Structures are given as C-alpha cells and as structure tokens.
C-alpha cells in the first residue's frame, strides 16, 4: 500500500512536468537574445492546519540536541507574512532555453540531526546526486519513485553518489529506525524550476519570451495515517507517517522581452 501511494504521487508529479506527452529529454539549449523573468510569491490563506509532530524514540543524543523530544515533520513551513517555503515552481512543457545549472546546495543531501537537509531537492535529469551523513549513527536512505535506492550510511561524513536518470519525484525515507525523516527529490528535465524561500518568494530567470503554463507544486502536509512497518536493520517495529498527495496549482503566464512577469499563488487547506 505504501509503495502504491508513493508511486501515485510520483505519477502526479511526472504528469505535471510533462503533461500528456513523454519526458522532456528533447529539451534544447539555445542562445537567448532578450529573455524575461518570472517572479512572485506563494502564500497561505486561511487558518493553519495542525501539523503533527513525531516522537524522537531513537538516538536522542544525536537526533535531538535541543532536547525537545519531538520532531517537526517539515511538511508545511509558513513564514510570519504567510509565505510558504519549499514549494516547487516550474514551467510546464518548455522545449528550449538556457542550459541547466541548478544551485549546488539543491543537489547535495545531508543527514544532520536525523533530518534531511535540504528538505526539497532539485536534481537535473541524468545528473549526479551526492548524499552525505553528518550523524554518528546508522542511517539508511531508502528512495522510491523516480529512483530506487537503499543506501546505508554507517560512517560519519560518508558520501555516496548516484545518477538520477529518470524525471519525476523520488520519495526519501530513513530505513535506519528514524521513521520521521522524510524528504522529496525532484528530478527535473529542464532548468526552469525553483524552490520558494522562507518568505515564499521565487524567481525564474532567462526565460525565452512566450506564453507558458506555470505550476506550483507542494508535497502535501496532512498525515493520513500511521502505518506499521518492520525495520530490517534495527530489527524493530516502527510507525511510519503516510502523507496526503501533493497539491498542484497551475496558471498561464506571458513573458516579454527584458520584462518581469509577476505571478502569485495562494495555497489553503481546502
């Protein structure tokens, strides 16, 4: 059941990326004469839902240096002015433009204090993802969806690299007994993707002039149930949170030469 839910979420993201066609391996890098920019915000509207926390029941001296004994699942981060962080904003079905060059911090996954940093990653299709563990405990990165890996990290500062050949959504969890750990990796077929900052702001630069569909994608914040699982490495039964499907919003945007188009998205718990 868990695998089916995650595969469905990956399919939803892939559909948003490529529409009804095939993955955009035919994206072409072209010279840009007078490109434009798309900028805007993603903001929350209405009361904030109650976001459940998770008890830290393994390696508290490593996972819980502040002794809070609970961990925020980091699924919905809303700033004081209502900006929603960790929302992926991208152009749908763009066929040509600038070369892909995603920021380095978004291509490197660290396991630190038993959480994944960053929580949302962008990795170019066919590029290399590097994964590190800064923790002095056993973590096992379990990945499914667009990529399927099960990678143990028994040593501190160990780095493992894997190529990500398939566009889509890869769910990341820990199979080392830290059931609250979760992250999402978006393997992207072109460079016009970004992730909102802590204020909910985003910007896409060097966009060829034209008409586009722009998508805001959020991983979803509701825990629909807890599911019992057996952790092979720790030989323990654990409870894993199972999350609701991602949320997707779409708009149309016109980009002019040397112009900035402003697009804002509003999210809510409906």
What are these regions (language model features)?
Residues 19-23:
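Sec/Tat signal peptide C-region and signal peptidase I cleavage site
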Residues 24-270:
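Extracytoplasmic copper-binding redox domains, predominantly the cupredoxin/blue-copper superfamily
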Residues 1-9:
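Bacterial N-terminal signal peptides that target proteins for export
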Residues 8-17:
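Bacterial N-terminal signal peptides
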């Amino acid at each position: 059941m868990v695998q089916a839910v995650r595969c469905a979420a990956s399919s939803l993201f892939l559909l948003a990326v490529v529409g009804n066609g095939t993955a955009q391996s035919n994206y072409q890098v072209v010279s840009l004469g007078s490109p434009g920019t798309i900028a805007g915000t993603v903001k929350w509207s209405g009361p904030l839902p109650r976001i459940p926390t998770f008890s830290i029941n393994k390696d508290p001296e490593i996972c819980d240096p502040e002794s809070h004994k609970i961990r925020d699942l980091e699924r919905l981060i809303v700033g004081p002015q209502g900006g929603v962080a960790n929302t992926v904003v991208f152009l749908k079905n763009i066929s040509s433009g600038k070369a892909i060059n995603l920021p380095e911090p978004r291509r490197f996954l660290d396991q630190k204090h038993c959480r994944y940093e960053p929580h949302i990653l962008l990795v170019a299709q066919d590029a290399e993802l590097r994964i590190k563990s800064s923790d002095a405990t056993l973590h096992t990165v379990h990945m499914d969806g667009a990529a399927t890996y099960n990678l143990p990290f028994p040593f501190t500062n160990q780095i493992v690299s894997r190529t990500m050949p398939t566009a889509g959504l890869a769910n990341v969890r820990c199979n080392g007994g830290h059931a609250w750990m979760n992250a999402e990796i978006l393997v992207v077929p072109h460079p016009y993707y970004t992730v909102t900052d802590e204020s909910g702001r985003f910007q896409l630069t060097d966009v060829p002039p034209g008409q586009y569909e722009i998508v805001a994608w959020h991983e979803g914040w509701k825990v629909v149930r807890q599911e019992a699982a057996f952790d092979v490495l720790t030989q323990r039964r654990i409870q894993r949170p199972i999350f609701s499907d991602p949320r997707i919003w779409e708009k149309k945007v016109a980009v002019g030469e040397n112009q900035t188009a402003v697009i804002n998205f509003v999210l809510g718990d409906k």
